[in-house]
């Protein structure tokens, strides 16, 4: 075990450990984003599935993995035999390889009719989601085991979001050019690009495993009365008001973000008639996200997490509204998208810092420390959001009359504009109301909670 500070709330983490933790979300987002960005288009344009079928695949698979996330959390909180690798790190190490194989397999076509292709694609995506849950939930849930310092948690969240943003940038900017290296065979080009990106994702996950340390792993004696089983774990979630509000917020914001990502490839090709623009837009907008991630820790120290979170949402809304009303050209689309993504950087970064703080809140309220279940309760809502966000674009593409590889009608173009701009705005406004009116955990309250928890331990 590494040396810890006498006061866990003041422990400072070394730079290389923060970097290693950020590499973890770089790797996991590469493995995730190639599917988020391109799998629906692969289903519709290469496999020949109707948009609704592609949406149903996402809906079923993501709802399934919402429950596998919860199962992963309960499994983590039920572990009693903790080896030298730690409580969470082994799953980062061992699950990353099958995740890589299945991320590639998702882009493999089958010689069946539409129904057979749909069934195989659904099963592959569900299996991918199962092992991804084991890897990614363990990665996210170990933050409370790394540090109890709220500033360091915010810093880890920034590094995590930086890694996630870089992963999204690489997938947005690089995937299509890599595909284009294989000419004349769309199926093979998808497999080639997916293989290359997935192998890099695997490498970064293993570097994360090697570079982070678990310092605060509490292993209680094996006692059925103390073991955090299903009922106790759900009690910890149900009585955790900040966690519940944060789950609602993520249901909205992640849904908005994922719909935007899924539709932008259609928007640039069929509305702006410039598919190459997606790479440039990704480059500049992700650069703005990096700026937001860099500024986030300082903004949090000055204004607090809640105010920065809501401020980011307001910037996001402004960017999307400007794009809808004034973003008819390529340059204006990129400029206003940069503004929206800059605002989203604060929101997406702070999600991970806020959910880590709710672990102590839940322990303070119920007496049960359930890092795994708190985190996966949070990701349950994120997966539900991803399920709906995966289904909704595919279903809406059918409703607005989208036909692949042809000039779209005026009604279809307007439908794409509303999907990529207005729909995210509405969800962002709902989130502003939820966080502004109902989220009650601030920095002063968190410090008091940690002190009371430590005092309880000394009196037992």
UniProtKB/Swiss-Prot annotation:
Membrane topology: Multi-pass membrane protein
Cell membrane is among the record's keywords: yes
Gene Ontology biological process terms from the UniProt entry: carbohydrate transport; sodium ion transport; transmembrane transport
Transmembrane segments: 19-39, 47-67, 92-112, 123-143, 162-182, 191-211, 243-263, 276-296, 308-328, 330-350, 387-407, 419-439
GO CC list: plasma membrane
Keywords from the UniProt entry: Cell inner membrane, Cell membrane, Membrane, Symport, Transmembrane, Transmembrane helix, Transport
Gene Ontology molecular function terms on file: symporter activity
One family name in Pfam for this protein: MFS_2
Residue numbers on the Periplasmic membrane side: 40-46, 113-122, 183-190, 264-275, 329, 408-418
Location(s), subcellular: Cell inner membrane
Stretches of the chain found on the membrane's Cytoplasmic side: 1-18, 68-91, 144-161, 212-242, 297-307, 351-386, 440-460
Main location class: membrane
Record carries keyword Transport: yes
Similarity field: Belongs to the sodium:galactoside symporter (TC 2.A.2) family.
Function, in words: Could be involved in the export of 2,3-dihydroxypropane-1-sulfonate (DHPS).
Protein name, as recorded: Putative 2,3-dihydroxypropane-1-sulfonate exporter
Species whose genome carries this gene: Salmonella typhimurium (strain LT2 / SGSC1412 / ATCC 700720)
Gene: yihP
């Amino acid at each position: 075990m590494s040396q810890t500070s006498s006061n866990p709330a003041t422990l400072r983490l070394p730079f290389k450990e923060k970097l290693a933790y950020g590499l973890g979300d770089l790797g996991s987002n590469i493995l995730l984003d190639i599917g988020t960005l391109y799998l629906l288009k692969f289903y519709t344009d290469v496999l020949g599935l109707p948009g609704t079928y592609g949406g149903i695949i996402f809906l079923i698979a993501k709802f399934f993995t919402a429950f596998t996330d919860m199962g992963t959390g309960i499994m983590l909180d039920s572990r009693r035999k903790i080896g030298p690798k730690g409580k969470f790190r082994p799953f980062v190490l061992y699950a990353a390889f099958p995740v890589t194989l299945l991320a590639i397999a998702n882009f493999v076509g089958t010689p069946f009719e539409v129904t057979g292709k749909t069934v195989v694609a659904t099963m592959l995506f569900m299996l991918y989601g199962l092992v991804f849950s084991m890897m990614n939930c363990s990665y996210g849930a170990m933050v409370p085991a790394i540090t109890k310092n709220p500033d360091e948690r915010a810093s880890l969240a920034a590094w995590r979001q930086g890694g996630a943003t870089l992963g999204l940038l690489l997938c947005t900017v690089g995937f299509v050019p890599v595909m284009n290296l294989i000419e004349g065979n769309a199926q093979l080009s998808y497999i080639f690009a997916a293989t290359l990106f997935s192998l890099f994702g695997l490498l970064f996950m293993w570097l994360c495993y090697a570079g982070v340390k678990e310092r605060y792993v509490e292993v209680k004696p094996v006692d059925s009365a103390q073991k955090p089983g299903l009922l106790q774990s759900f009690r910890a979630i149900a009585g955790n008001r900040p966690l519940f509000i944060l789950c609602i917020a993520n249901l909205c914001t992640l849904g908005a973000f994922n719909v935007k990502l899924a539709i932008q490839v259609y928007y640039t090709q069929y509305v702006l008639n410039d598919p190459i623009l997606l790479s440039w837009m990704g480059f500049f907008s992700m650069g703005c996200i990096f700026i937001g991630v860099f500024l986030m820790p300082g903004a949090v120290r000055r204004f607090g997490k809640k105010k920065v979170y809501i401020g980011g949402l307001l910037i996001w809304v402004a960017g999307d509204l400007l794009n809808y009303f004034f973003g008819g050209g390529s340059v204006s689309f990129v400029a206003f998208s940069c503004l929206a993504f800059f605002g989203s950087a604060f929101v997406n970064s702070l999600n991970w810092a806020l959910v880590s703080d709710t672990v102590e809140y839940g322990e303070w309220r119920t007496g049960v420390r359930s890092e795994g279940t708190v985190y996966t309760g949070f990701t349950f809502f994120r997966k539900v959001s991803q399920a709906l966000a995966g289904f909704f674009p595919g279903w809406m593409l059918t409703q607005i009359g989208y036909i692949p590889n042809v000039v779209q009608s005026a009604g279809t173009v307007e439908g794409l504009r509303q999907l990529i701009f207005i729909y995210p705005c509405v969800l962002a406004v709902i989130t502003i109301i939820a966080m502004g009116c109902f989220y009650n955990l601030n920095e002063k309250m968190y410090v008091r909670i940690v002190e009371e928890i430590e005092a309880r331990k000394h009196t037992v």
